[in-house]
Amino acid sequence: MALHITLLDGKLHDRSGFSCGIAALDDYLHQRAGQHQRDGIATTHVLTDNTQPARILGFCALSAAQLHLSELQQADLKRLPAYPVPAMRMGRLAVSAAEQGKGYGQLLLGHVVNLALSVRQTMGVRVLIVDAKDAQAATFYERYGFRTTTSKALSLYLPISAA
């Protein structure tokens, strides 16, 4: 089995067969992801394997964003202009209930960080923002270096460095 992460393709990927156990995330993939992608609101990246390329193992949704300076931790304010910093937002991250515990969330997150680093080469991206659904999700992101914003405990960001 070889894993692949690609953009959602409504003609190829079976969105209706996906269930992560969280209705809001399932509904987004089933009902809004395709439209958001067509309208330029967000892109949805899906994890599949070559043995069943239509079956979605996990997904994440990305969009452009900004983060106000007042939401950054003090240590992250160095050498920044006096206006919001450019960001990439990962609005959703979900793994199929049948596939949880296999490291697919970590794989998708790594994909997003690599995309942010790549985008940074062509336009400004200072941080990757996530809005965790609950404290357990926030803990997942904190394990990978995300920091809570000063305004909300479930809103986190990861500084994207050029290194």
Protein language model features and the residues they cover:
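Extended hydrophobic secondary-structure segments that form protein cores and membrane-embedded regions
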Residues: 45-49, 60, 90, 127-132
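Conserved beta-hairpin
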Residues: 40-64, 71
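Short amphipathic alpha-helix that is part of the acyltransferase structural core
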Residues: 1-35, 39, 55
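Conserved acetyl-CoA-binding loop-helix of GNAT-fold acetyltransferases
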Residues: 101-115, 143
